[in-house]
A protein has these predicted regions:
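Short, hydrophobic beta-strand segments
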Residues: 7-11, 48-54
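Short amphipathic alpha-helices in soluble, non-transmembrane regions
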Residues: 24-25, 64-72
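Helix N-cap motif at beta-to-alpha junctions
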Residues: 17, 54-62
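Short, ordered loop/turn segments at secondary-structure junctions
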Residues: 40-43
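Long hydrophobic segments that form regular secondary structure
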Residues: 11-38
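Short, small-residue-biased leader/transition segments that mark boundaries at the very start
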Residues: 1-2
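A common structural junction motif
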Residues: 30-35, 69-77
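Glycine-rich, acidic loop segments that terminate in or are immediately followed by a histidine
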Residues: 59-66, 76
């Protein structure tokens, strides 16, 4: 059985529109992400937001963290 180490990278966003999300998903898959998805969340003061998640090889975690910061309005990522 083959086991592969993967990284989970996430960020919460409250000011992103669907077009930017779609663009990011396409770029991340083109760059080699294993999976990319966004989940609706409720943020503080009951504001709607999005949890953006990228699964990638552990060796690519820095690359996808930088992509998230460059292509979205995120101030940081959770790894």
């Amino acid at each position: 059985m083959l086991f592969r180490s993967v990284a989970l990278i996430e960020t919460n966003l409250d000011d992103i529109n669907a077009e930017i999300l779609g663009h990011f998903v396409e770029k991340a898959f083109a760059a080699g992400a294993l999976d990319v998805f966004h989940t609706p969340i409720q943020m503080k003061k009951n504001r709607p937001g999005v949890l953006l998640t990228v699964l990638c090889a552990s060796t690519d975690a820095d690359k996808f963290s930088e992509l998230l910061l460059r292509e979205t309005s995120a101030f940081g990522v959770r790894r």
